[in-house]
């Protein structure tokens, strides 16, 4: 009986170790890295203009999609201008809540319009794992765009 149990136990420990190592090696972006992505996106936006910047933000596996981090953007009313999920582009997300009912888009837009930048936390479907997870997003308003990037929290 011990021999039958040892293989599944070793498999579980190996799986946990691989997952832990992946986090330790930086496969999961951090809030600091999310903020850095926003700052990098703003530099690109200011240097190349909004049309080219939005095109680059929307490019699959482009400069602004790294690990599990990605830049997304909306206008001051909540209409999405850039997002890895192309179905969201052009859609007004202002009233759309997170999976727990929190109006996080509204919070991002309102704070960006009143303060210019900040952080908002919410629960979101992780596009890599397919599971609900806590996320914190940094955003900054530049002209008529709100540039955002969020990191999933452990």
Protein language model regions, located:
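N-terminal membrane-sensor/transducer module of prokaryotic signaling receptors
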Residues: 2, 7-9, 13-154
């Amino acid at each position: 009986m011990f021999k039958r149990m040892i293989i599944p136990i070793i498999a579980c420990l190996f799986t946990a170790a691989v997952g832990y190592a992946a986090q330790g090696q930086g496969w999961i972006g951090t809030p600091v890295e999310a903020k850095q992505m926003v700052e990098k996106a703003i530099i690109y936006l200011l240097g190349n203009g909004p049309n080219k910047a939005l095109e680059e933000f929307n490019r699959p596996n482009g400069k602004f999609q790294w690990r599990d981090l990605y830049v997304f953007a909306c206008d001051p009313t909540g209409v999405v201008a850039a997002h890895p999920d192309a179905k969201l582009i052009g859609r007004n997300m202002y009233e759309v809540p997170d999976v727990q009912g929190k109006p996080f888009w509204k919070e991002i837009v309102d704070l960006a319009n009143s303060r210019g930048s900040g952080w908002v936390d919410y629960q979101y479907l992780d596009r890599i794992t397919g599971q609900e997870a806590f996320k914190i997003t940094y955003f900054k308003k530049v002209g008529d765009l709100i540039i955002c990037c969020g990191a999933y929290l452990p």
